[in-house]
Regions:
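Repeated loop/turn-to-beta-strand initiation elements of outer-membrane beta-barrel proteins
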Residues: 22-24, 62-66, 110-113, 168-174
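Membrane-embedded beta-strand positions of outer-membrane beta-barrel proteins
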Residues: 24-28, 68-70, 101, 117-119, ...
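Outer-membrane beta-barrel proteins
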Residues: 57-62, 103-109, 166-168, 180, ...
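Transmembrane beta-strands of outer-membrane beta-barrel pores
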Residues: 28-34, 72-76, 98, 107, ...
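Hydrophobic, lipid-facing positions within transmembrane beta-strands of outer-membrane proteins
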Residues: 48-54, 97-101, 115, 119, ...
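Sec/Tat signal peptide C-region and signal peptidase I cleavage site
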Residues: 15-20
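Extracellular/periplasm-exposed beta-strand and loop segments of Gram-negative cell-envelope proteins
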Residues: 32-46, 75-96, 126-159, 182-195
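Outer-membrane beta-barrel "beta-signal"
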Residues: 23, 192-204
Length: 204
């Protein structure tokens, strides 16, 4: 998995070295994380995320291109109750990097507006994954998934999206990342991370 992440990062550096179109992106993600314990029915745990990063699009031939990027992501989820400013439950927070390597095809609809279809893998590397418990407003124990070696830092998803670009300056992307790899290291738990994303970008 480390080799895959290194190859993806190398693809980003390659696109920087050539005459590539550069984007600055910020976005929001709605996580739909599939969790299954043993033979029990899987459940979906939702989360929220914000992202920021840069990407470069290299035109291959005609309307085809390859876009590679590097993004920072902060993801959080709260499960519990809160009353009289006292909360009981658990707060999970994830920080990480992702490298999308997406093939795209452009459909020019007007002189100043283009639609693109994007498809390809997205590689994730986790920096921090912690869950903090609270009882009656008091902070309890903290579980660090990486220190406890419960989860893999590396993850791969299949990404697809539709982008709109106008005036050669602005763009938006509506995308979906389908989690492929099981990031939980135990044999009794299945955990895959998927996310619906909305991104705004500025074109340099």
């Amino acid at each position: 998995m480390k080799k895959i992440f290194a190859i993806a990062a190398a693809a980003l550096l390659f696109t920087c070295a050539v005459n590539a179109q550069t984007y600055f992106n910020v976005g929001y993600g709605y996580g739909m994380n599939k969790v299954q314990f043993g033979n029990l029915e899987p459940e979906t745990v939702s989360s929220n995320a914000i992202t920021a990063g840069i990407s470069h699009n290299f035109a291959i031939d005609g309307n085809f291109g390859i876009e590679a990027g590097l993004n920072y992501m902060h993801d959080w989820n709260w499960e519990g109750l809160e009353a009289n400013d006292k909360k009981t439950g658990a707060m999970s927070r994830f920080d990480g990097l992702n490298v999308p390597v997406l093939v795209n095809y452009a459909f020019p609809l007007a002189s100043d507006f283009t639609v693109k279809a994007l498809l390809g893998p997205k590689f994730f590397y986790g920096l921090s994954d912690k869950t903090t418990t609270y009882a009656g407003g008091e902070k309890g124990y903290v579980v660090n998934s990486y220190d406890d070696e419960n989860c893999s830092r590396f993850n791969v998803s299949a990404s697809a999206g539709i982008a709109g670009e106008w005036c050669n300056k602005f763009r938006f992307i509506l995308g979906y990342d389908l989690g492929i790899t099981d990031i939980d290291k135990s044999d009794s738990v299945l955990r895959k991370q998927s996310m619906l994303t909305f991104t705004l970008g500025y074109i340099f």
